[in-house]
């Protein structure tokens, strides 16, 4: 998942992103390390926040806006 890359591009900490998504810093950390997968609702929130498609977020495409 491209979550860490997108977060760093916005110069955000895990905690600040967690607060924006109404989740915990631990959840963001687990998503970034692949130890936990976000549910569909959370995937949509993340994709909308970064203005990218879910396919881009999940590395299924290199086009950030595809199928958005």
Model-identified regions with their sequence ranges:
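Recognition helix of helix-turn-helix/homeodomain-like DNA-binding domains
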Residues: 22-37
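Short, basic-rich loop-to-helix N-cap that marks the start of a DNA-contacting helix
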Residues: 35-45, 66
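Conserved hydrophobic/aromatic packing and binding residues within compact polymer-binding modules
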Residues: 3, 17-18, 28-31, 57
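Short, charged recognition helix plus adjacent turn
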Residues: 9, 58-68
């Amino acid at each position: 998942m491209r979550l860490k890359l997108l977060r760093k591009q916005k110069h955000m900490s895990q905690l600040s992103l967690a607060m924006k998504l109404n989740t915990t810093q631990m959840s963001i950390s687990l998503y970034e390390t692949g130890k936990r997968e976000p549910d569909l609702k959370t995937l949509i929130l993340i994709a909308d926040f970064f203005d990218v498609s879910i396919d881009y977020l999940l590395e299924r495409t290199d086009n950030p806006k595809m199928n958005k």
